[in-house]
A protein has these predicted regions:
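Alpha-helix-loop-beta-strand connector modules within alpha/beta enzyme cores
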Residues: 51-74, 131-136, 140, 305-311
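Internal, glycine-rich beta/alpha segment that forms the wall or movable "lid"
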Residues: 2, 50, 84-188, 203-216, ...
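N-terminal beta1-alpha1-beta2 module of alpha/beta enzyme domains
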Residues: 1-67, 168-170
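Hydrophobic faces of well-ordered beta-strands that scaffold small-molecule active sites
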Residues: 4-8, 38-40, 73-75, 103-107, ...
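Active-site mouth loops of central-metabolism enzymes
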Residues: 8-20, 78-86, 168-177, 259-271
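A structural motif
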Residues: 35, 100, 189-190, 285-286
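N-terminal small/glycine-rich loop or linker at the start of catalytic domains
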Residues: 1-15, 70, 112-117, 151-169, ...
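Short, acidic/polar
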Residues: 17-30, 91, 174-184, 269-279
Length: 311
């Protein structure tokens, strides 16, 4: 059965200021309405002209954890090569402890070269660095003592406690589009997380992930899939089309090398949104992260009360 998460607005448009009290209220209401999970976006820097304000994802989820009790907390997705993996293991492991075992770790290799330059990480080596960092992080979470020397990292009987609440560790979803990423998702991740994919594109990508899992000697049935979709519940598709297209084309990116597209958008009357989402549910996707139009509280209410009960 498909579960439904909700994206949080820790990332805002140019010239805006993140509304922290509003974010807390949004998270508390999402939990009360029965959403399965909340997902924070991740960048260190994003954009020059314009630039996009973004609150750190791990910090934001930690604050939300203190104000909620049961809703799961996901990074959608953390740019792992930008983080020191030992420090990331500590911060993320602590988040799992603080939240009582609610972390879902979505990770990706990243795409914004300026961000890598600013942090001092070689952009063209991000795939290799991603795999190295993920290996170090998972070792620290799952092994009693870690002894490993790789690149600049020299772990000598490193012990990371307290242990994560989830055993053997929190679930790790690999985000991205190209075959190298899909292979990582199938071979070393617990599943795949993608963004703005139509049902057809999602099915194509997920079949590849499962094939890569089988090649690695893994059972694809142990993996989970997640797709992120923008949703606008209005009176009709005609009424919602222009506003949705403008929002997606001015505040969101779709990678040219992927099949992500603003044409994925779920919009229209409640009945029309239900019909469009049913096409995604039929793909067998395990989780859909909904991005409500402009994160409006009334959209969250309408999605929870008029759309989800009919799926």
């Amino acid at each position: 059965m498909t579960s439904y998460g909700l994206a949080v607005r820790n990332f805002v448009g140019p010239g805006e200021v993140p509304d922290i009290p509003g974010l807390y209220a949004y998270a508390e209401r999402a939990e009360a309405l029965g959403f399965e999970s909340l997902w924070a976006w991740d960048h260190v820097l994003l954009g020059v002209e314009p630039s996009f304000p973004i609150v750190d994802s791990i910090t934001m989820l930690g604050a939300i954890a203190a104000r909620t009790r049961t809703i799961k907390l996901g990074t959608g997705v953390l740019v792992l090569p930008l983080r020191n993996p030992v420090v990331a293991a500590k911060a993320l492991g602590s988040l799992d402890v603080i939240s009582g075992g609610r972390l879902i770790l979505g990770v990706a290799a990243g795409w914004y070269a300026r961000e890598f330059d600013a942090v001092g990480i070689p952009f063209k080596q991000r795939g290799k660095i991603f795999e190295r960092n993920l290996d170090i992080l998972t070792r620290l979470w799952t092994q009693e003592r870690v002894t490993l020397k790789v690149d600049e990292f020299n772990l000598r009987e490193a012990v990371m406690v307290p242990r994560t609440v989830q055993k053997p560790r929190p679930p790790i979803l690999v985000g991205g589009y190209v075959d190298a990423v899909l292979k990582r998702a199938g071979a070393i991740g617990d599943g795949w997380l993608t963004y703005f994919y139509t049902p057809e594109s999602f099915t194509k990508g997920w079949e590849k992930v499962k094939a890569f899992a089988r090649e690695a000697g893994r059972d694809p049935r142990t993996l989970t899939s997640t797709n992120q979709l923008a949703v606008y519940v209005g009176s009709s598709r005609a009424q919602t089309a222009e506003d949705m297209r403008h929002w997606l084309s001015t505040e969101w990116d779709t990678a040219a090398w992927s099949e992500s597209t603003i044409e994925h958008a779920i919009h229209g009357s409640a009945e029309e949104c239900v019909a469009q989402l049913k096409a995604h549910v039929k793909t067998g996707v395990d989780r859909i992260i909904l991005i409500p139009y402009r994160y409006q509280p009334e959209q969250v209410e309408r999605i929870a009360k008029e759309v989800l009960p009919r799926l």
